[in-house]
């Protein structure tokens, strides 16, 4: 078995994983090493992985039960897969503001497994990530104390599928 490499990309968040072929069913030790890297670095990525929808689903399933987004259109044959596409004719770009996927649900998924298949010819289309652990640690002790123990209410708004439980 080829050794997995974990290379941090910033001091606070993100690591590149190498030495693994996501098209294959992974050994439990490999899944555990990837899970550890994810927990430590919060965002992980794998280069040069040409996956089908089925392989994408199979990889993600090794980390837990998959979620079907209640408000976003999904692939007709794979409800766990959301197709996000924008081009020069698009009137709106999905996810263009800071957000965390599906946090409006009572039990949101622990994470998202993204797969990029096409990039804009001009090099745009960046996806940015931020560490909320680092953001919290950068707060003053007084503000941390103010926030500790508080609960946030995340709402989806008036989109189809949004719940407004009191």
Predicted stretch roles:
Residues 2-166:
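Non-heme Fe(II) oxygenase catalytic core, chiefly the N-lobe of the double-stranded beta-helix
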